């Protein structure tokens, strides 16, 4: 009945009962953020309680088949999801949505009728990223490029979005996005498994140049990928524009010689793989 006092009375009761101040404050802050733009819990203890509460609600309601439909959201699950994402991202917590939902679902035992509850909750939460970033003015295609890779660690998801948003401003972005679309179409038609690049098979200067460039970059960016420094990764990959353009201008991928054709497909497969470690930039407009 007194929604404005949610958490407040619990805090005062805890203080009255002699609980630690951190516990008392956490009882109040577990409901944060209460609305869009509201402040977050200040301590990690309060953040942990807030996340536990939100994931328990999301998993339980999805588990009984009561996911939001259309504009109806009687259990405020959209707010709970966005609140959880904000806490994880803005506090840069190394948490994975799948791990959290699995742990939450396990606590319900066999009481959840929805057998796909983990995937459903994770997909729902990733979908809330779209609304969040659109409110920030980030282009929809940037969000889609990251969603295509389905990273489930929110802080990592955010780092990818920031990196792709930056990449989109570079002079080479449009050409490389178009090239990646072309590469995707070519690889989709490959009729055999694609192996590794063999430099000794290269005959054209343009294909050798691209092969050497992607192999060098694969080694160079790996530590950056592991560090989550996606902006630097894409800055380095942007340098591929010239060799990529030269490759498509001077090399016929579907050569008659099977070994030559497979090696050229391997070059393109490696090129695509470099970008896919961050996002699917082929969806950029």
From Swiss-Prot:
Catalyzed reaction equations: tRNA(Gly) + glycine + ATP = glycyl-tRNA(Gly) + AMP + diphosphate
Pfam families: DALR_1, tRNA_synt_2f
Gene Ontology terms, MF aspect: arginine-tRNA ligase activity; ATP binding; glycine-tRNA ligase activity
Compartment annotation: Cytoplasm
Keyword field: Aminoacyl-tRNA synthetase, ATP-binding, Cytoplasm, Ligase, Nucleotide-binding, Protein biosynthesis
UniProt-listed SUPFAM superfamilies: HD-domain/PDEase-like (SSF109604)
InterPro entries registered for this protein in UniProt: DALR_anticod-bd, Gly-tRNA-synth_bsu, Gly-tRNA-synth_heterodimer
The keyword Nucleotide-binding is annotated on this UniProt entry: yes
Assigned GO CC terms: cytosol
GO BP terms, alphabetized: arginyl-tRNA aminoacylation; glycyl-tRNA aminoacylation
EC number: 6.1.1.14
Keyword Transferase in annotation: no
Family the entry assigns: Belongs to the class-II aminoacyl-tRNA synthetase family.
Quaternary structure (record): Tetramer of two alpha and two beta subunits.
NCBIfam families membership: glyS
The protein's name in its UniProt record: Glycine--tRNA ligase beta subunit
Source organism (scientific name): Haemophilus aegyptius
Gene coding for it: glyS
């Amino acid at each position: 009945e007194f929604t404005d006092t949610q958490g407040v009375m619990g805090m005062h009761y805890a203080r009255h009962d002699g609980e630690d101040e951190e516990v008392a404050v956490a009882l109040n802050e577990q409901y944060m953020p209460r609305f869009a733009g509201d402040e977050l819990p200040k301590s990690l203890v309060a953040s942990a309680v807030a996340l536990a509460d939100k994931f328990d609600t999301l998993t339980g309601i999805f588990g009984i088949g009561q996911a939001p439909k259309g504009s109806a959201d009687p259990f405020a699950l959209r707010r709970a999801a966005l609140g959880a994402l904000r806490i994880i991202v803005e506090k840069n917590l190394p948490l994975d949505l799948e791990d959290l939902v699995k742990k939450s679902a396990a606590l319900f035992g066999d009481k959840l009728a929805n057998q796909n509850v983990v995937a459903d909750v994770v997909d729902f939460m990733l979908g809330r990223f779209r609304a969040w970033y659109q409110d920030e003015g980030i282009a929809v295609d940037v969000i889609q490029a990251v969603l295509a890779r389905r990273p489930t660690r929110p802080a990592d998801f955010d780092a990818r979005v920031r990196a792709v948003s930056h990449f989109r401003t570079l002079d080479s972005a449009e050409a490389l996005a178009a090239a990646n679309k072309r590469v995707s179409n070519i690889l989709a038609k490959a009729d055999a498994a694609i192996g590794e690049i063999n430099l000794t098979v290269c005959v054209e200067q343009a294909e050798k140049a691209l092969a050497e460039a992607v192999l060098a970059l694969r080694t160079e960016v790996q530590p950056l990928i592991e560090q989550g420094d996606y902006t630097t990764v894409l800055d380095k990959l942007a340098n591929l524009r010239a060799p990529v353009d030269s490759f498509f201008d001077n090399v016929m991928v579907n050569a008659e010689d099977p070994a030559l054709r497979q090696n050229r497909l391997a070059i393109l497969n490696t090129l695509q793989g470099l970008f896919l470690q961050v996002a699917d930039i082929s969806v950029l407009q």
